[in-house]
C-alpha cells in the first residue's frame, strides 16, 4: 500500500541518519596509498620496517587507507610519482620537482652532514663553495645548500671513502643515518670527520592525480591531528630519533629543483 511504502522509506531514512560517519571520511578517497622510497637504513627498509614506514602507517591506516610500501632507487621513485604510477614518494624536499603536489605539513627533517678526512679543515655551511662535493645522484643539494660551486653525483655510496682517500672529492654530503652507515664499513672511522650542516624538512610529494589530490588533503589533516595530540612522538622515540616538531626546522634554501 502507498502509505505503508512511505513509512518504509521514512524508516530507512531514520536508520541511515543514525549510522556513524567518520569525521575524515570522503566518498571518493582511495582505501590504499602506494608509497615509494629509496631504501634508507632504519628508515624505509625493503621489508617494510623503519621509522619512515612506521610514520606512514600511523598517518594513513587509522583513517582507513592501507599503506603499500615499495622500495626503488630515488630517481625512479620520483619518476613513478610523476607518471602517476605511485601515489607519493617518501623523503621529498619542498618543491623538489615540477609536476607533483606538495602538502603544507612536513613529517620529518633531514639532518644533513658533511663527511671528510679528519686531517682536512673542518667545513662550515658558508664555506661549501670552496670544496669539491659529492652526493648521491638525484639528491641535488645545490638547490638547498648555499654557495655550491663544484660537485659530482655518484650512483652508489660504496666508493665514497675511497673517493675521499684518493682526493677525488673533499666532502661527501648526505643525511646522518647514511653517513653513519658508510662509516660502519671502515675499520678506521677515526680517520674521518662528520660535520653538521643543516636540517631540511621532509615531505611526501604526491602524484598530480585525483588519488594524489585526495590523499594530500588527508595527509595534511592527519598531520595536524597527530602533531597536536603528540601521537607521533613515541614513534620517533622508539627509533631513537629526535622529535622534529620540537625544533624550528627551516631549510637553508628553498626553490624548485631543476
Spans of features found by a protein language model:
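Extracytoplasmic small-molecule ligand-binding "clamshell" domains
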Residues: 25-100, 134, 238-239
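Flexible hinge/capping segments at coil-to-helix
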Residues: 115-133
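Secondary-structure junction motif
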Residues: 123, 132-147, 176
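Ligand-binding clefts/hinges and TM-proximal coupling segments of bilobed small-molecule sensing domains
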Residues: 140-156, 223-258
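Short beta-strand-to-loop elements that line the ligand-binding cleft
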Residues: 66-73, 149-156, 160-163, 194
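A ligand-binding cleft/hinge motif common to bilobed small-molecule-binding domains
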Residues: 79-83, 92-100, 170-198
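Bacterial N-terminal signal peptides
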Residues: 7-17
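Periplasmic-binding protein-like
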Residues: 37-38, 109-112, 184-220, 243-257
Amino acid at each position: 500500500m502507498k502509505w505503508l511504502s512511505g513509512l518504509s522509506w521514512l524508516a530507512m531514512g531514520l536508520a541511515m541518519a543514525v549510522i556513524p560517519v567518520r569525521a575524515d571520511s570522503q566518498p571518493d578517497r582511495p582505501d590504499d596509498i602506494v608509497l615509494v622510497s629509496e631504501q634508507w637504513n632504519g628508515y624505509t627498509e625493503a621489508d617494510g620496517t623503519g621509522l619512515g614506514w612506521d610514520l606512514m602507517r600511523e598517518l594513513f591506516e587509522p583513517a582507513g587507507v592501507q599503506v603499500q610500501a615499495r622500495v626503488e632507487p630515488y630517481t625512479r621513485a620520483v619518476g613513478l610519482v610523476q607518471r602517476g604510477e605511485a601515489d607519493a614518494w617518501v623523503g621529498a624536499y619542498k618543491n623538489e620537482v615540477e609536476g607533483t603536489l606538495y602538502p603544507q605539513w612536513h613529517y620529518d627533517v633531514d639532518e644533513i652532514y658533511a663527511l671528510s678526512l679528519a686531517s682536512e679543515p673542518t667545513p662550515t655551511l658558508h664555506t661549501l663553495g670552496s670544496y669539491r662535493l659529492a652526493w648521491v645522484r638525484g639528491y641535488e643539494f645545490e638547490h638547498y645548500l648555499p654557495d655550491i660551486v663544484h660537485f659530482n653525483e655518484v650512483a652508489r655510496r660504496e666508493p665514497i671513502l675511497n673517493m675521499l682517500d684518493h682526493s677525488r672529492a673533499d666532502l661527501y654530503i648526505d643525511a646522518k643515518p647514511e653517513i653513519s652507515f658508510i662509516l660502519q664499513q671502515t675499520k678506521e672511522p677515526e680517520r674521518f670527520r662528520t660535520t653538521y650542516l643543516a636540517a631540511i624538512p621532509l615531505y611526501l610529494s604526491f602524484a598530480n592525480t585525483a588519488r594524489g589530490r585526495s590523499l594530500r588533503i588527508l595527509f595534511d589533516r592527519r598531520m595536524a591531528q597527530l602533531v597536536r595530540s603528540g601521537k607521533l612522538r613515541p614513534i620517533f622515540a622508539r627509533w631513537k630519533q629526535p622529535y622534529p616538531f620540537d625544533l624550528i626546522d627551516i631549510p637553508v634554501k628553498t626553490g624548485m629543483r631543476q
